[in-house]
């Protein structure tokens, strides 16, 4: 079977809600990375066979936001492009679709990833198309409803985390401790240049003066403590334990990479970072969607012909501390190998981009001692996706 490799994997800094990227559309964040990847590899843009980009909150952006990103990023109009929505798994699903298209011989080079600007998601007035006869009307927050609400139970993703708290007996202190550790690991990595190789700075033009250049993730908090987090009120249930401090943020960002056949990479003298070994997807009861990575990880390992003990590093999306703790318990993961640079609780969770973001961060950790990695994300609606990669040799 054709070996599929990953190269030129990058991400933008991750912006906080209403932060530096509040006026930068998702497709502009994506375009920044596309332009950088083309320039860095020296690849002729016309040689890219297809572009596949995850994006969840698409309302108001225009037709096919991935196409907008590709064209603004310098790709010719002849390159076909489509947008993927698998909620939090969108970015990684895009890479899986690229992988599948190469294995089947349809493509040799695909640019894949994800992008999201949650700050720009619009408010909607449903049923207003033909006017209202009388009475009050309300707006729907497209970010909350299309991105963060379980439609089957009509409640916020945070309640699915509270459901896992009850099922697994996870304490508030455990969650807050997990969140603090994520922040500390991310702060340490940020201070010591641990993200420098994966981040492409984003230049934001200003009406007056020089552009603002964003180079670092905005959500990392160096001085957080369990004591400080313990003062936060529950966010989703009156007597709950999930808070804004032990959950991932609402964020803006993008992540992209080249997915190629090994033969094409050799032909073009592009040095791969890793080989894609296999993927796994899984579904569970939507009310406990956060536990779905367990099944996805097991399937990805089986398809990759690997055991959990073969994995040197894990990048698992931290939707909620409770969700992460439940998955860690089920899989019995070694904590020293999981999210060694922190996770989404610290870095942020731009939902359409996160699947690609966790893989980008993983790829930049591979070396002679860390040769095999696994990444996974839970997905709203009761799903998960996972991937296994190995350092290219």
From Swiss-Prot:
Domain of life: Bacteria
InterPro entries reported for this sequence: Thiolase, Thiolase-like, Thiolase_acyl_enz_int_AS, Thiolase_AS, Thiolase_C, Thiolase_CS, Thiolase_N
Name of the protein: Probable acetyl-CoA acyltransferase
Subcellular location: Cytoplasm
Catalytic residues (positions): 88 (acyl-thioester intermediate), 349 (proton acceptor), 378 (proton acceptor)
SUPFAM superfamilies recorded: Thiolase-like
EC number: 2.3.1.9
EC class: transferase
Reactions mediated catalytically: 2 acetyl-CoA = acetoacetyl-CoA + CoA
Cellular component aspect of the GO annotation: cytoplasm
Subcellular location, principal: cytoplasm
Residue intervals passing through the bilayer: none
Pfam families according to UniProt: Thiolase_C, Thiolase_N
Gene Ontology MF, one: acetyl-CoA C-acetyltransferase activity
Assigned keywords, A-Z: Acyltransferase, Cytoplasm, Transferase
Family membership: Belongs to the thiolase-like superfamily. Thiolase family.
């Amino acid at each position: 079977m054709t070996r599929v490799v990953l190269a030129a994997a990058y991400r933008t800094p991750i912006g906080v809600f209403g932060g530096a990227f509040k006026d930068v559309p998702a497709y502009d964040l994506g375009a920044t990375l596309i332009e950088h990847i083309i320039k860095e590899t020296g690849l002729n843009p016309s040689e890219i066979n297809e572009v596949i980009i995850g994006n969840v909150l698409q309302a108001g952006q225009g037709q096919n936001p991935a196409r907008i990103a590709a064209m603004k990023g310098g790709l010719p109009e002849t390159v076909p492009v489509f947008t993927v929505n698998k909620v939090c798994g969108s970015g990684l699903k895009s890479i899986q679709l690229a992988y599948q298209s190469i294995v089947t011989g349809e493509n040799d080079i695909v640019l894949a990833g994800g992008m999201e600007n949650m700050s720009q998601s619009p408010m909607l007035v449903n049923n207003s198309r033909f006017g209202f006869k009388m009475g009050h009307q309300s707006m729907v927050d497209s970010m909350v409803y299309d991105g963060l609400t379980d439609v089957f139970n009509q409640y916020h993703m945070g309640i699915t985390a509270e459901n896992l708290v009850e099922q697994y007996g996870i304490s508030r202190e455990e969650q807050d401790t997990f969140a603090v550790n994520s922040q500390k690991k991310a702060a340490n990595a940020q201070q010591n240049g641990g993200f420098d190789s994966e981040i492409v700075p984003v230049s934001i033009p200003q009406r007056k003066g020089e552009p603002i250049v964003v180079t670092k993730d905005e959500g990392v908090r160096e001085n957080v403590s369990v004591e400080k987090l313990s003062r936060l009120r529950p966010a989703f249930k009156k007597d709950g334990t999930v808070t804004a401090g032990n959950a991932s943020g609402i964020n803006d960002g993008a992540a992209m990479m080249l997915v190629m056949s090994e033969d094409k990479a050799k032909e073009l003298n592009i040095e791969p970072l890793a080989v894609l070994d296999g993927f796994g997807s899984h579904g569970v009861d939507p009310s406990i969607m956060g536990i779905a990575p367990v099944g996805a990880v097991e399937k990805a390992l089986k398809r990759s012909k690997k055991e959990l003990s073969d994995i040197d590093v894990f990048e698992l999306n931290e939707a909620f501390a409770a969700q992460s703790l439940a998955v860690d318990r089920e899989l019995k993961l070694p904590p020293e190998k999981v999210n060694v640079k922190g996770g989404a609780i610290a870095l942020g969770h731009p939902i359409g981009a996160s699947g690609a973001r966790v893989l980008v961060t993983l790829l930049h950790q591979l070396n002679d001692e860390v040769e095999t990695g696994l990444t996974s994300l839970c997905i709203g609606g009761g799903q998960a996706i996972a991937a296994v990669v190995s350092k290219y040799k």
